[in-house]
Curated annotation (Swiss-Prot):
Lacks alpha-helical transmembrane segments, suggesting that it resides in the membrane via beta-sheet conformations similar to those predicted for other outer membrane proteins and porin. Transmembrane segments: none annotated. It is found in: Mitochondrion outer membrane. This is Mitochondrial distribution and morphology protein 10. Belongs to the MDM10 family. Component of the ERMES/MDM complex, which serves as a molecular tether to connect the endoplasmic reticulum and mitochondria. Components of this complex are involved in the control of mitochondrial shape and protein biogenesis and may function in phospholipid exchange. MDM10 is involved in the late assembly steps of the general translocase of the mitochondrial outer membrane (TOM complex). Functions in the TOM40-specific route of the assembly of outer membrane beta-barrel proteins, including the association of TOM40 with the receptor TOM22 and small TOM proteins. The keyword Transmembrane applies. Keywords: Membrane, Mitochondrion, Mitochondrion outer membrane, Transmembrane, Transmembrane beta strand. It comes from the Eukaryota. PANTHER family: MITOCHONDRIAL DISTRIBUTION AND MORPHOLOGY PROTEIN 10 (PTHR28035:SF1).
Amino acid sequence: MIEYMNYVIKSLQSNNDYEHLTLSSRSLLNFKIPNAFKFQLSNKSTPYTYNTIDISTNKVINGSITYLYTDAKGLDKLIKDSHNINIQSIVETYNHHCKTLNINKQNVDFKSLYYGRMYYPNSHLEGMIIKKFTTNTQVVLKWVSSFNSCNIITGYFQKYGKRNFQELIVSSNDFLCGYRFLHNFIEQPSKLNNSLYNNSYISLGGEFWLAISTLSPTCATTLRYCTHSATTGRPLTLTLSFNPLFGHLSSTYSAKTSSNSAFCVQYDFNLYSIDSNLSLGCELWKQNELIQNVSQEKSKKQEIQVPPNFYNNNSNDAKQKRILNDLNTTFESSLKKIDKERAVIENFETDLYNKDFTSVWKFSTSLRDKNLCILWDGKFKGFLLSAGTELIRINTNNENNSQSLVKFYPAKLGLQLQFST
């Protein structure tokens, strides 16, 4: 479960960038597990300012104070308190990349955003400034400061587009410079209608880095394919990532198996060391059984009526008329099939968006790490709760006999509570 300030920033930013190219697999496999007790209290003091204070206990008491200001208007329609928030908005879950998801999404325009956070008792500071010059270009400045002379400043110049994304990065840490890009290969809409195939597209992204102080380069590229099932309308995503310098190859398959579940499998392989790993992850959503949304009825498919002899009504030849009637019947069935596929996709995503979920279970495991990660996110009486653990496998020797026993013990265990007004 993401924090409140990240939820506010996420509502203002686009996820059409290289960083979110493999978001679906990361959300199902590498989700964050709390390792201590943490309580976070947030509120919206003015229409443009947000405040957060949190306290955590991990052997010692730690905490932080966060402040955010933005000149965005109309955030009341997007930012909800913990009692009215949609749990799908604050949980890192399967990311729908296809175009039909933007059913009820609203765009909020803003020119600047200021974010600051101070940790205590160590007094670490972190901040961020986002300044938009145009609708598609912005500059992001992030910095981290502490008393042990650890001061890092990183600047980003980002340019967004419907199909393209470009980003230049400069950091004071080893004078690191980087360039990241993303291009979406979207098929042109059909002249007849928007069909299933217009919701399938390929995304290609890459990143190039160079540490000027040590002259250490690195690069990576990622390919993503998104589509829907023709019969059920459920989305699925395939990614392939490759780092040529380290020889790391990673492939993922993520699918929304139903409106209440998602599954992901990832296979990693190194070309140089021949090491491999297989990771599995899934999430199970629970719907509120007391509150049923009446408006979740499936929309009726729109049938396109093609009149007989549509292409030629002036032919006097009986044989030619029979051929034209066969052509009309063929095109009519194709149009109905196109509309049926589109209706199935739109109905699935509309039904998913309108469902009232109360909690979600997440599970992930890895053959190489031999662990089991469990996370539960949910709502209870206006509070947002997140509890999880990571079980790892260890071998212990039995004193009575020399046989080794396999045991599992929790390497991480924690509980996080959030409340916002």
